[in-house]
Amino acid sequence: PSLGVLMTSALAAADEIIIPLQCEWFGLEGLSKIVHVIELIRESGSNVQLEGILMTMFDGRTNLSRDVVAEVEKYFPEQLYRAIIPRTIRLGEAPSHGKTIFEHDARGTGARAYEGFTDEFLARKAIEPVGLQ
């Protein structure tokens, strides 16, 4: 990701950061840059925290996806969410239809994965989920 002035300002203004990370090697490079910038921002007096890392575009058929998750787990075991967002056609289609995945394919694998992430996030924060009807 680009770490220009806007991104750096957003990081400095935030209390907590969740980093969505594609299961690709370039994603790991971006992660190391963001973590470094967060450290620099904290040194300047900000209290920003890395809340978590959400693995996205996971393809269980490839060693690459599994290797990237393993690498993140090795260095960020506490921050890594156990929920993993898979690479699916329906997740890719939803934005092109101007819809969320819950509008486009509410019972699909992608929607269920995001629901799992939401549940995990809320559990970490000790917040009771409110059902979407």
Locate predicted features.
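Hydrophobic helix-cap positions at the C-terminus of alpha-helices
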Residues: 41, 121-124
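C-terminal helical "lid" subdomain and adjoining coupling/linker elements of P-loop NTPases
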Residues: 125-133
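A cross-family signal for key residues in well-ordered alpha-helices
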Residues: 35, 115-118
